[in-house]
UniProtKB/Swiss-Prot annotation:
It catalyses: tRNA(Tyr) + L-tyrosine + ATP = L-tyrosyl-tRNA(Tyr) + AMP + diphosphate + H(+). It comes from Borrelia hermsii (strain HS1 / DAH). It is found in: Cytoplasm. This is Tyrosine--tRNA ligase. Its EC number is 6.1.1.1. The gene is tyrS. Belongs to the class-I aminoacyl-tRNA synthetase family. TyrS type 1 subfamily.
């Protein structure tokens, strides 16, 4: 197998390929131009998007040429893959703002001095519908399209005609990138298999060129929790939507069984180092988790931000001397302390828990600390004297901490 593809396989990135043997031979002969597409449905990517772009980075490190295709055009349609209902159609202005924000995030992850970032609205916005149907639609079989899982599932719940067109547009993207940049490989999540295969087929039938599609596995957690979701919602790459500290802590607190897998997927550490640190047992495995959290935070937010997050976590949970300013905080109104405030009420209002019953249960079980003092009384109250230093630290167990400031 080609060296670059071997790296992807070793690190857990390979799921399906249209013709792995032929792709491997071609990648041994030439520097492959390849692309990953992402629609601009949000102002930020989330960690689920990291998998294809980490694969992109590994291929680029082996000399291959990446294209990040941001879907300013396809977002106006909406991909039905993995969705039970039609996506909300965004205003043009929102899509343009999202495209700009996503491009800025990608520039932190991929070196595009040796690659491209392209917005597919460059060609999709100018399509003549009649010509598109005659030139492109003729190559698509409705019967075949309905055989793909995305459409089969959605037909039961309702599939709009606008969504049904999405596969044609994504296939057209591959066709255009092959014409413009000699792109011969599309990489995407496994839910994109139908769209990718259709693009491969279109390029071959329209241009007579063999191109390839490669999909990546759906990443899961061993504890059954959905990857990329936290108690605070989606784990975004934008620090304004999901703080750098919380991002660091998300990876610091992954299940023990996932540490090795995530080190391979979310870092650029060498195999030997990953095998070594993931072999740690007991409390020593925390060192591997800290390495994982630091490395992926460095990739997404930069080394300086990763160091600050690591320092803040050390100060919060190990009693270190790090800067605590990066620890999440909740600002409490002074009027709330005119008398006293129940700790249970403060826990709910600060959203460190979702309900009073959860707060009481945690207090009763001995899992709640105020300034490192365990609180066992469900009726425990705080007043102005509690905030003599202007803030308190509220901690639940070993993983969740919040500064309450005045």
């Amino acid at each position: 197998m080609n060296l670059a593809l071997g790296i992807l396989e070793k690190r857990g990135f390979l799921k399906q390929c249209t013709n792995l043997e032929a792709l491997s031979v071609l990648m041994d002969r030439e520097k492959m131009v390849f692309y990953v597409g992402v629609d601009a449905t949000s102002t930020s990517l989330h960690i689920g998007h990291l998998i294809p772009f980490m694969a992109m980075a590994h291929l680029q490190r082996q000399g291959h040429i990446p294209i990040a295709l941001v879907g300013g055009g396809t977002t106006k349609i909406g991909d039905p893959s993995g969705k039970d209902v039609m996506r909300k159609i965004l205003p043009k202005e929102d899509i343009e703002a999202n495209v700009k924000a996503i491009k800025e995030q990608l520039l932190r992850i991929i070196d595009f001095s040796h690659g491209y970032i392209i917005d597919n609205s460059e060609w999709l916005d100018n399509i003549n519908y009649i010509e598109f149907l005659r030139d492109i639609g003729v190559y698509f079989s409705v019967n075949r399209m309905l055989g793909f899982e995305t459409y089969k599932r959605r037909l039961k719940d309702g599939l709009s005609f606008i969504e049904f067109n999405y596969q044609l547009l994504q296939s057209y993207d591959f066709y255009m990138l092959n014409k413009l940049k000699n792109c011969k490989l599309q990489i995407g999540g496994d839910d994109q298999w139908g769209n990718i295969v259709s693009g491969v087929d279109l390029v071959k039938r329209k241009l007579g060129t063999e191109v390839f599609g490669l999909t990546l596995p759906l990443i899961t957690r061993s504890d059954g929790k959905k990857m990329g979701k936290s108690e605070k919602g989606a784990v975004y790459l934008d620090s304004k939507l999901y703080s750098v500290y919380d991002f660091y802590q998300y990876f610091r607190n992954v299940p023990d069984l996932d540490v090795k897998k995530f080190l391979y997927l979310f870092t650029f550490l060498e195999d030997d180092e990953i095998e070594h640190i993931s072999s740690f047992q007991g409390y020593l495995l925390n060192k591997a988790k800290e390495t994982l959290a630091f490395e992926i935070t460095k990739i997404v937010h930069g080394e300086s931000a990763a160091l600050k997050a690591s320092s803040a976590a050390s100060a919060a949970f190990k009693g270190g001397e790090g800067d605590k300013s990066d620890i999440p905080f909740f600002k409490l109104a002074l009027t709330s302390l005119e008398g006293t405030i129940l700790l249970v009420d403060l826990m709910v209002s600060s959203k460190i828990v979702s309900s009073k019953s959860e707060a009481r249960r945690l207090i009763s079980s001995g899992g709640v600390y105020v300034d490192k003092v365990r609180i066992g009384d469900q009726n425990y109250c705080l007043n102005k004297d509690s905030f003599a230093n202007g803030a308190i630290e509220l901690r639940i167990g070993k993983k969740k901490i919040l500064r309450i400031i005045l």
